[in-house]
From Swiss-Prot:
Residue intervals passing through the bilayer: 3-23, 29-49, 67-87, 92-112
Xref: InterPro entries: FluC (IPR003691)
Molecular functions (GO terms): fluoride channel activity; metal ion binding
Residues annotated for Na(+) binding in this entry: G71, T74
Enzymatic reactions: fluoride(in) = fluoride(out)
Originating species: Staphylococcus epidermidis (strain ATCC 35984 / DSM 28319 / BCRC 17069 / CCUG 31568 / BM 3577 / RP62A)
Keyword set, alphabetical order: Cell membrane, Ion channel, Ion transport, Membrane, Metal-binding, Sodium, Transmembrane, Transmembrane helix, Transport
Function: Fluoride-specific ion channel. Important for reducing fluoride concentration in the cell, thus reducing its toxicity.
Main localization of the protein described in the UniProt heading: membrane
Protein name per the record: Fluoride-specific ion channel FluC 1
Length: 121
């Protein structure tokens, strides 16, 4: 049964990811990946905090949300590829800003998600 939850979550995450990737069209800045990864970090923190109480009795829902939805939504490999592309195109300032802000804001988003999710658990 857990595979069904992961499958459905993955389909939803992939669809959201695809829609966000349209923000990248015609732009040097990979905004879609940036938004997807920050949103995913925030939601992972929230779900992680909520799982302490809410998902104890529903572990399949947690797997569907984390492994399925957020696994398909976020993408480390695309992020790395975009960084390499920016570097190869000699966009060194954008490369640095995108890399540094993605990591710092990703950690802060996850932290904020943990704090907010913890209030509801």
């Amino acid at each position: 049964m857990q595979y069904l939850y992961i499958f459905v979550g993955g389909a939803l995450g992939a669809l959201i990811r695809f829609c966000l990737s349209m923000l990248n069209e015609g732009s040097t800045i990979p905004l879609g990946t940036f938004v997807a990864n920050l949103l995913g970090a925030f939601l992972m923190g929230s779900i992680g905090a909520l799982s302490l109480s809410l998902f104890k009795t529903h572990p399949n829902i947690k797997k569907g949300l984390t492994t399925g939805l957020l696994g398909a939504l976020t993408t480390f490999s695309t992020f790395q590829f975009e960084l390499v592309t920016l570097f190869n195109q000699h966009h060194f300032i954008l490369f640095t800003i995108y890399g540094v802000t993605s990591y710092i804001l990703g950690i802060l988003s996850c932290y904020l998600g943990v704090k907010i999710g913890g209030r509801f658990s």
